Amino acid sequence: MPNVDDSVMGRQMPSSFDENHEFYNEKPMAKIFRKLREEPLIPLGAGLTVFAFTQAWRPMRRGDQVSANKMFRARVAAQGFTVLAMIAGSMYYNKDREATKELRKLKEERDSEEKRQKWIRELEIRDEEDKAMRARVMNRRAKAEEAKAGNASATPAEGGEAKSGVLNALGLSGSSSGWGKPGEAPLADASKAVDDEPIVSKVKTPTNVKRVSAEDDKTN
């Protein structure tokens, strides 16, 4: 990015205007008085022209044509003198006017460059603030996600511990009572009881049938 001193003030300026801050910030009235001091013949010629015109107007009212003509000639001479003074002053101060125009242009360029630099700095500051705000939002979001993941992983473990604690309190845990999955232990006990029962008692023989019949007859 070009610097103000390199791009705007890099060109050589006239030595008479070095460090001349009053010239850069000159007020309108100060400029008028400066022009009057630099070219005093122009206002002098303008004053003589006005004076000759007024002096010609009075003889005209009185009807003195000779005096009026003299004043008109004097007015024309004063006006010509003013024009010559303007031309001579323009030729004499041409270099200074060019320098003044150049300095005015440099001042405008410097002001515009300063405004652009301020605008760029403001944009950079806003960009940094935006980046910092986005970083804070991302950090908060990451912390919230980490906390949420930690709570989700801690909840199943706590549920398992609570369940095992209740089973131990009731004495129904798998290690103490031999219970495994629901429905497995009763089936195993029933099959074991059936296997332990004698086969003879389960089968009714003819002898047993006769014995039962005899006992029934006695009873009757």
From Swiss-Prot:
The keyword Cytoplasm does not apply. One of its GO terms (biological process) is mitochondrial respirasome assembly. The keyword Plastid does not apply. Residues 13-104 form the HIG1 domain. It is a multi-pass membrane protein. Residues 164-179 have a biased composition (Low complexity). Residues 91-145 form a coiled coil. It is found in: Mitochondrion membrane. One of its GO terms (cellular component) is mitochondrial membrane. Keywords: Coiled coil, Membrane, Mitochondrion, Transmembrane, Transmembrane helix. It comes from the Eukaryota. InterPro entries: Hypoxia_induced_domain, RCF1. This is Respiratory supercomplex factor 1, mitochondrial. The lineage of its organism: Eukaryota, Fungi, Dikarya, Ascomycota, Pezizomycotina. The gene is RCF1.
